[in-house]
Amino acid sequence: MDEALYKFLKWTAIALGCAWVGWSIYDSFMREHAPGDFEYKRAEQFFADDEYQRALKEYEDALDENPQHIYAMRGKARALLQMRRFDEAMAQYDKVISAQPDLGVNYANRGILFDRLGRYEQAIADYEKALALDPELDEGPHWLTRFLRNQPEKPPTIGDRAKYLRAELAKPPEQRVLRVPEIDEKQRTYKQ
């Protein structure tokens, strides 16, 4: 490695390190946080690690501190869904949708819940409402998100699922394949 390249790489590394430290200090100490934000961030980490019970506790702590914390409300609904506490998840999604009726991810996630409950017509309706509000949901996770999840292949989107359900529901009941549990359980909720 020649001297000029070495100096460039060294100073780039130093600059990036300083920028990261500066941002960390700003984000931790100087930026104002709404009540419940710290608990929400802890909950999101637990959720990412598939520790849904611990995530639920942190979401609830965030909501105790700030009952209107919409991100914690949505996170709580997602955690309840993953824990298969479907009735509680439905009540929470209904609350979230009444608080934010124009956000597509809310309908997408409730559609996933309807899908898991076998309420396919309602799932289709929510999937289509989600796509009408936010067409980008049909693109699925970004390549970087898939990389970080170690998910090399693009998973089916809610648009794909809605088309599949419509096609299956058009068949005679004895020919329908609406549920493949090992595939269906891999469907991830949306975060925004």
Briefly describe each language-model feature range.
Residues F29-Q68, G75, Q82:
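Alpha-helical segment of the N-proximal tetratricopeptide repeat
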Residues P35-D37, I70-Y71, G104-V105, D138-E139:
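Helix-start (N-cap) detector for alpha-helical repeat units in TPR-like alpha-solenoids
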Residues D2-A19, D138-Q192:
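Terminal, low-structured helical/coil segments at or just beyond the last alpha-helical repeat
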Residues K41, G75, N109, W143-L144, ...:
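Canonical tetratricopeptide repeat
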Residues A48, E60-D64, D94-S98, K129-A132:
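Conserved structural position within tetratricopeptide repeats
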